[in-house]
Amino acid sequence: MKVNKLKIGTSDSKYEIIIGQKILKNSSQYIKKSCPNVKKIALVIDKNIPQNFVNILKTSLKKFKVYSFKYSVNEKFKSTHNALKLAETCLSKNFNRNDLIISFGGGILGDLSGFAASIIKRGINFINIPSTLLAQVDSSIGGKTGVNSKFGKNLIGAFYQPKLVISDVELLKSLPKREMVCGYAEILKHSMILKSNFCTHLF
Protein backbone atom coordinates (compact mmCIF):
# COMPACT_ATOMS: atom_id res chain seq x y z
CA MET A 1 0.00 0.00 0.00
CA LYS A 2 1.21 3.50 -0.84
CA VAL A 3 2.27 5.72 2.06
CA ASN A 4 0.36 9.00 2.09
CA LYS A 5 1.45 12.12 3.93
CA LEU A 6 -0.86 14.94 4.90
CA LYS A 7 0.59 18.24 6.05
CA ILE A 8 -1.31 19.94 8.87
CA GLY A 9 -0.69 23.59 9.68
CA THR A 10 -1.92 25.85 12.46
CA SER A 11 -0.89 29.37 13.42
CA ASP A 12 1.87 28.03 15.67
CA SER A 13 2.56 24.46 14.56
CA LYS A 14 3.07 22.24 11.53
CA TYR A 15 3.15 18.45 11.45
CA GLU A 16 2.53 15.45 9.21
CA ILE A 17 0.01 12.65 9.31
CA ILE A 18 1.57 9.55 7.78
CA ILE A 19 -0.95 6.98 6.54
CA GLY A 20 -0.13 3.52 5.25
CA GLN A 21 -0.21 -0.20 5.83
CA LYS A 22 2.47 -1.96 7.90
CA ILE A 23 4.33 1.29 8.55
CA LEU A 24 4.85 0.76 12.29
CA LYS A 25 8.21 -0.82 11.48
CA ASN A 26 9.33 2.52 10.01
CA SER A 27 8.34 4.56 13.07
CA SER A 28 11.93 5.30 14.06
CA GLN A 29 12.77 7.05 10.80
CA TYR A 30 9.61 9.15 10.97
CA ILE A 31 10.36 10.12 14.57
CA LYS A 32 13.95 11.11 13.83
CA LYS A 33 12.71 13.46 11.14
CA SER A 34 10.06 15.15 13.28
CA CYS A 35 11.96 15.06 16.61
CA PRO A 36 15.66 14.96 15.65
CA ASN A 37 17.03 15.50 19.18
CA VAL A 38 14.94 12.96 21.07
CA LYS A 39 16.77 10.45 23.28
CA LYS A 40 14.14 9.24 25.74
CA ILE A 41 10.65 8.05 24.92
CA ALA A 42 7.68 7.32 27.18
CA LEU A 43 5.68 4.77 25.19
CA VAL A 44 2.11 4.75 26.52
CA ILE A 45 0.25 1.65 25.33
CA ASP A 46 -3.37 0.52 25.42
CA LYS A 47 -3.49 -3.06 26.76
CA ASN A 48 -6.04 -3.98 24.07
CA ILE A 49 -3.47 -3.64 21.29
CA PRO A 50 -2.26 -7.09 20.18
CA GLN A 51 1.27 -7.83 21.35
CA ASN A 52 2.60 -8.40 17.82
CA PHE A 53 1.96 -4.74 17.00
CA VAL A 54 3.59 -3.63 20.25
CA ASN A 55 6.64 -5.75 19.44
CA ILE A 56 6.95 -4.24 15.95
CA LEU A 57 6.88 -0.72 17.37
CA LYS A 58 9.34 -1.49 20.17
CA THR A 59 11.76 -3.08 17.70
CA SER A 60 11.66 0.06 15.58
CA LEU A 61 12.42 2.19 18.65
CA LYS A 62 15.32 0.10 19.95
CA LYS A 63 17.91 2.85 19.36
CA PHE A 64 16.11 5.11 21.83
CA LYS A 65 15.83 4.79 25.60
CA VAL A 66 12.23 3.64 25.88
CA TYR A 67 10.10 3.48 29.02
CA SER A 68 6.91 1.52 28.38
CA PHE A 69 3.61 1.92 30.22
CA LYS A 70 0.56 -0.29 29.58
CA TYR A 71 -2.90 0.70 30.71
CA SER A 72 -6.42 -0.65 30.69
CA VAL A 73 -8.17 2.34 29.19
CA ASN A 74 -11.67 3.64 29.90
CA GLU A 75 -13.25 7.00 30.78
CA LYS A 76 -12.30 6.61 34.46
CA PHE A 77 -8.65 6.31 33.39
CA LYS A 78 -8.82 9.77 31.83
CA SER A 79 -8.15 11.63 35.07
CA THR A 80 -5.87 14.36 36.39
CA HIS A 81 -4.36 11.76 38.72
CA ASN A 82 -3.21 9.54 35.85
CA ALA A 83 -2.01 12.46 33.73
CA LEU A 84 0.06 13.84 36.61
CA LYS A 85 1.38 10.36 37.42
CA LEU A 86 2.64 10.00 33.83
CA ALA A 87 4.15 13.49 33.93
CA GLU A 88 5.87 12.87 37.27
CA THR A 89 7.25 9.55 36.01
CA CYS A 90 8.77 11.26 32.98
CA LEU A 91 10.30 13.92 35.23
CA SER A 92 11.73 11.22 37.49
CA LYS A 93 13.51 9.84 34.40
CA ASN A 94 14.98 13.31 33.71
CA PHE A 95 13.01 13.93 30.52
CA ASN A 96 13.83 17.26 28.92
CA ARG A 97 11.99 19.27 26.27
CA ASN A 98 13.66 17.32 23.45
CA ASP A 99 12.27 14.03 24.73
CA LEU A 100 9.02 12.42 23.71
CA ILE A 101 5.74 10.87 24.78
CA ILE A 102 4.15 8.48 22.28
CA SER A 103 0.51 7.49 22.64
CA PHE A 104 -0.17 4.06 21.12
CA GLY A 105 -3.90 3.54 21.47
CA GLY A 106 -7.28 5.14 20.99
CA GLY A 107 -8.67 8.59 21.65
CA ILE A 108 -8.80 8.41 25.45
CA LEU A 109 -5.13 7.45 25.69
CA GLY A 110 -4.16 10.11 23.16
CA ASP A 111 -6.05 12.81 25.05
CA LEU A 112 -4.37 11.96 28.36
CA SER A 113 -0.88 11.42 26.94
CA GLY A 114 -1.01 14.65 24.96
CA PHE A 115 -2.13 16.58 28.03
CA ALA A 116 0.72 15.09 30.07
CA ALA A 117 3.17 16.12 27.34
CA SER A 118 1.76 19.66 27.37
CA ILE A 119 2.39 20.19 31.09
CA ILE A 120 5.88 18.67 31.41
CA LYS A 121 8.32 21.59 31.41
CA ARG A 122 5.61 23.60 29.63
CA GLY A 123 5.63 21.18 26.71
CA ILE A 124 7.68 18.24 25.47
CA ASN A 125 7.38 16.39 22.18
CA PHE A 126 4.24 14.33 21.60
CA ILE A 127 3.50 11.80 18.85
CA ASN A 128 0.20 10.01 18.33
CA ILE A 129 -0.03 6.50 16.90
CA PRO A 130 -3.81 5.94 16.88
CA SER A 131 -4.94 2.31 16.97
CA THR A 132 -8.68 2.75 16.34
CA LEU A 133 -10.48 4.04 13.27
CA LEU A 134 -12.19 6.76 15.30
CA ALA A 135 -8.84 7.98 16.63
CA GLN A 136 -7.22 7.84 13.19
CA VAL A 137 -9.90 9.98 11.54
CA ASP A 138 -10.79 12.30 14.42
CA SER A 139 -9.23 12.54 17.87
CA SER A 140 -5.57 12.26 16.82
CA ILE A 141 -5.96 15.36 14.64
CA GLY A 142 -6.40 18.92 15.84
CA GLY A 143 -4.45 19.04 19.08
CA LYS A 144 -7.28 18.64 21.57
CA THR A 145 -5.89 17.06 24.74
CA GLY A 146 -7.37 16.75 28.19
CA VAL A 147 -8.80 14.77 31.05
CA ASN A 148 -12.09 14.51 32.86
CA SER A 149 -13.17 16.37 35.99
CA LYS A 150 -15.77 15.53 38.61
CA PHE A 151 -17.76 18.32 36.94
CA GLY A 152 -17.74 16.71 33.49
CA LYS A 153 -15.76 15.24 30.60
CA ASN A 154 -12.77 16.96 28.98
CA LEU A 155 -13.00 20.04 31.22
CA ILE A 156 -9.28 20.12 32.03
CA GLY A 157 -6.97 20.28 29.03
CA ALA A 158 -5.10 22.21 26.40
CA PHE A 159 -4.72 22.55 22.67
CA TYR A 160 -1.35 20.92 22.09
CA GLN A 161 -0.40 19.78 18.61
CA PRO A 162 1.54 16.54 18.09
CA LYS A 163 4.85 16.55 16.26
CA LEU A 164 3.60 13.66 14.13
CA VAL A 165 0.69 11.26 13.67
CA ILE A 166 1.40 7.74 12.37
CA SER A 167 -1.77 5.99 11.16
CA ASP A 168 -1.06 2.36 10.31
CA VAL A 169 -4.25 0.92 8.85
CA GLU A 170 -2.98 -2.60 9.59
CA LEU A 171 -3.95 -1.94 13.21
CA LEU A 172 -7.61 -1.75 12.20
CA LYS A 173 -7.67 -5.48 11.44
CA SER A 174 -7.61 -6.19 15.17
CA LEU A 175 -10.67 -4.07 16.00
CA PRO A 176 -14.11 -5.43 16.93
CA LYS A 177 -17.04 -4.49 14.71
CA ARG A 178 -18.37 -1.90 17.17
CA GLU A 179 -15.10 0.05 17.06
CA MET A 180 -15.15 0.10 13.26
CA VAL A 181 -18.77 1.27 13.20
CA CYS A 182 -17.90 4.16 15.55
CA GLY A 183 -15.10 5.20 13.21
CA TYR A 184 -17.24 5.00 10.08
CA ALA A 185 -19.95 7.07 11.79
CA GLU A 186 -17.41 9.84 12.33
CA ILE A 187 -16.23 9.59 8.70
CA LEU A 188 -19.84 9.85 7.52
CA LYS A 189 -20.42 12.91 9.68
CA HIS A 190 -17.33 14.61 8.27
CA SER A 191 -18.29 13.72 4.71
CA MET A 192 -21.75 15.24 5.09
CA ILE A 193 -20.24 18.47 6.40
CA LEU A 194 -17.57 18.72 3.70
CA LYS A 195 -18.47 17.37 0.27
CA SER A 196 -21.58 15.58 -0.92
CA ASN A 197 -19.66 13.63 -3.55
CA PHE A 198 -17.42 12.15 -0.84
CA CYS A 199 -20.52 11.12 1.10
CA THR A 200 -21.79 9.37 -2.04
CA HIS A 201 -18.41 7.66 -2.46
CA LEU A 202 -18.76 6.03 0.98
CA PHE A 203 -21.83 4.15 -0.21
What does each of the following model-derived ranges do?
Residues 1-100, 189:
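ATP/NTP phosphate-donor binding region
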Residues 9, 114-203:
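A glycine/threonine-rich phosphate-anchoring loop and its flanking beta-alpha core
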Residues 25, 50-51, 108-110, 173:
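Glycine-rich nucleotide phosphate-binding loop and flanking beta-alpha elements
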Residues 46, 111, 168:
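Acidic active-site catalytic centers that drive phospho-/nucleotidyl reactions
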Residues 55, 79-82, 112-115, 137-140:
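Short, conserved acidic/polar surface loops in the N-terminal third of protein domains
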Residues 83-89, 106, 119, 127, ...:
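Hydrophobic, well-ordered secondary-structure scaffolds
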Residues 99-118:
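Glycine/serine-rich anion-binding loops at beta->alpha junctions
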